[in-house]
């Protein structure tokens, strides 16, 4: 009888224990399903998985426009918008494309027109209509060279250059929609939306995508650029296929990060392109805060910025030692000078992430950089 009673007790405990396990598992499944692939802008609490532990993290519910309006971005990076117009012709052609128009260069690059993004967003934040109109003029010149399949006629480095321009336009239009001037510039948003959508549909054509991704292989930052270009356009237009492609690019980028936080460029580290990639990944986080990839993207950004901090000298200057692409390694498109190291992408990456996470250590780093490069206390 005692043995039978003991066995019955074991069965009872086993059944209760199984129910508890099932309840716990069901709770986790419901939570994960609720956070998977949601495209709402309002960020809540997400799960960051580290070493098989679920650690809750909080991301700001602020809009991208509000992040762009934070002190250092608004008052330092967007302070001198007139300087961005100096390289632009009255017809809107910008940078290396000016040389192409005057037959001084063999190629033009659609990416050179992406600086309309800074002019428009900076103009929205600082109430500068002249800068906004100059930005639209840059975009207009670019789209004037778009052909029926969505690509840009004989632009150099077609896939990569297009991804730069697409990201800038999609990002700009989304920020306009969040700004107090959304009604004023509604016609411009309506005009550019189908044009940028057509460009992204060209990017994901099987033969175009395959070739473009192959050419992007040595450059980690391009994974996050492509993800932002396609993801933000998908968000803007409601095209879910673009968002799926953007997630592919995010996953590819995540797989490349080294244990020390480096996102490699041409087989090594680069203290400039490190933050360029982070900047685009941060935008992806802002627009897809509840996607199931977010915990890993947040972890990648934290590690990337922590490594970048090791490249900042006590003075606030960014070290170029060992860089594979900037600081005397590669020249800009028109060949007039070597690529510099920041400080724009570095200040933006740290300041923006401080706004998203509320972590003031990133803000302190951004201010340290600002003090050195802009002599602002």
Q: What is the predicted function of each stretch?
A:
Residues 16-30:
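Bacterial N-terminal signal peptides
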Residues 94, 197-377:
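Extracellular polysaccharide-recognition and catalytic grooves
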Residues 29-47:
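Signal peptide processing junction and immediate N-terminal pro/mature segment
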Residues 96-198, 204:
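N-terminal catalytic cores of secreted or lumenal carbohydrate-active enzymes
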Residues 85-89, 143-147, 257-258, 312:
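Glutamine-centric residue-chemistry signal
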């Amino acid at each position: 009888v005692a043995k039978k009673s003991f066995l019955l007790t074991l069965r009872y405990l086993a059944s209760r224990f199984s129910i508890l396990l099932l309840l716990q598992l069901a709770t986790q499944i419901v939570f994960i399903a609720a956070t998977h692939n949601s495209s709402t802008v309002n960020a809540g609490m997400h799960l960051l998985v580290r070493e098989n532990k679920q650690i809750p993290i909080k991301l700001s519910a602020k809009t991208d426009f509000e992040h762009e309006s934070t002190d250092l971005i608004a008052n330092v990076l967007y302070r001198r918008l007139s300087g961005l117009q100096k390289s632009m012709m009255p017809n809107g052609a910008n940078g290396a494309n000016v040389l192409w128009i005057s037959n001084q260069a063999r190629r033009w690059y659609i990416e050179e027109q992406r600086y309309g993004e800074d002019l428009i967003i900076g103009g929205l934040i600082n109430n500068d209509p002249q800068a906004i109109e100059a930005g639209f003029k840059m975009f207009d010149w670019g789209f004037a060279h778009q052909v029926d399949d969505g690509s840009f006629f004989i632009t150099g480095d077609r896939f990569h250059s297009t991804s730069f321009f697409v990201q800038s336009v999609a990002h700009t239009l989304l920020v306009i929609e969040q700004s107090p001037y959304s009604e004023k510039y509604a016609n411009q948003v309506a005009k550019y939306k189908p044009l940028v959508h057509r460009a992204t549909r060209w990017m994901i054509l099987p033969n175009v995508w395959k070739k473009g991704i192959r050419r992007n292989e040595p450059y980690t930052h391009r994974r996050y650029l492509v993800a932002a270009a396609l993801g933000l356009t998908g968000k803007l237009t409601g095209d879910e296929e673009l968002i799926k492609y953007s997630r592919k690019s995010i996953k590819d980028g995540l797989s490349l990060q080294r244990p020390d936080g480096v996102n490699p460029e041409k087989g090594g580290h680069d203290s400039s392109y490190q933050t360029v990639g982070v900047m685009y990944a941060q935008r992806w986080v802002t627009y897809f805060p509840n996607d199931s990839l977010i915990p890993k993207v947040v972890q990648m950004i934290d590690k990337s910025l922590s490594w970048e901090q090791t490249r900042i000298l006590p003075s606030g200057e960014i070290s170029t030692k060992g860089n594979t692409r900037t600081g005397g390694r590669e020249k800009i498109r028109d060949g007039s000078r070597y690529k510099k190291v920041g400080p724009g992408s570095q200040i933006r990456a740290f300041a923006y992430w401080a706004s998203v996470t509320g972590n003031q250590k990133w803000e302190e780093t951004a201010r340290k950089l600002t003090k050195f490069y802009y002599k602002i206390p």
